[in-house]
From Swiss-Prot:
The keyword NADP does not apply. The gene is PRP. This is Repetitive proline-rich cell wall protein. Residues 27-236 are annotated as: 42 X 5 AA approximate tandem repeats of P-P-V-[EYV]-[KQG]. Residues 143-177, 204-236 are annotated as: Disordered. One of its GO terms (cellular component) is extracellular region. GO terms for molecular function: structural constituent of cell wall.
Length: 236
């Protein structure tokens, strides 16, 4: 197996190496360079492309409600400030000359003693005052009639509202497959009859209510004087 691989490599080397060696029998032929003038292309006019304006309807953006952001309180460590040393300032003592104040003479004031005799106040007796209730007849107030007030009609000019263009929105039909619901069987529930024992209610005793008599003072009615009626004279 190894000998067959070696023979294959040897044949490949003998075939490739002679082709790669230089040919010294024929010298290379010199070919002068050929001048090629540059090709000038005329400028090509490209008219500007006009795009029709695209109408974009206004998009409603609902207001964004941002939840309140909790900011924990910032705790700052106490800053140590060393005490500032201030050297003592020397203040010389201020000398004030003594001020002479002559003594003020105040003569003594005589105040005789005030004697107030005791005042006797006999007790004042006030009998209880009974005021009869005052009767106030009802006051008749005729109804007040207000004339109708004429209010002319208010004319409002028509307000022009331009039509709002809404692009059609395609909504594909929603197909809901039928849902099979098997019938639910509920067995009958037996409820035994509930017997309530009789509740005894004792009789409630209500004492008789005694109302004190209401005092009604007599109402004074003045005598009504009727004027004399004069008839025609009678002839015998």
């Amino acid at each position: 197996m190894a000998s067959s691989n070696f023979l294959v490599l040897l044949l490949f080397a003998l075939f490739v190496i002679p082709q790669g060696l230089a040919n010294y029998d024929k010298p290379p032929v010199y070919q002068p360079p050929v001048y090629k003038p540059p090709v000038e292309k005329p400028p090509v006019y490209k008219p500007p492309v006009e795009k029709p304006p695209v109408y974009k309807p206004p998009v409603y953006k609902p207001p964004v409600e941002k939840p309140p952001v909790y900011k924990p309180p910032v705790v700052k460590p106490p800053v140590y400030k060393p005490p500032v040393y201030k050297p003592p300032v020397y203040k010389p003592p201020v000398e004030k000359p003594p001020v002479y104040k002559p003594p003020v003479y105040k003569p003594p004031v005589y105040k005789p003693p005030v004697v107030k005799p005791p005042v006797y106040k006999p007790p004042v007796y006030k009998p209880p005052v009974e005021k009869p209730p005052v009767y106030k007849p009802p006051v008749y107030k005729p109804p007040v009639e207000k004339p109708p007030v004429y209010k002319p009609p208010v004319e409002k000019p028509p307000v022009y509202k331009p039509p709002v263009y809404k692009p059609p929105v395609y909504k594909p039909p929603v197909v809901k497959p039928p849902v099979y619901k098997p019938p639910v069987y509920k067995p009958p529930v037996y409820k035994p009859p509930v017997e309530k024992p009789p509740v005894y209610k004792p009789p409630v005793y209500k004492p008789p209510v005694e109302k004190p008599p209401v005092y009604k003072p007599p109402v004074y009615k003045p005598p009504v004087e009727k004027p004399p009626v004069y008839g025609p004279p009678h002839h015998p």
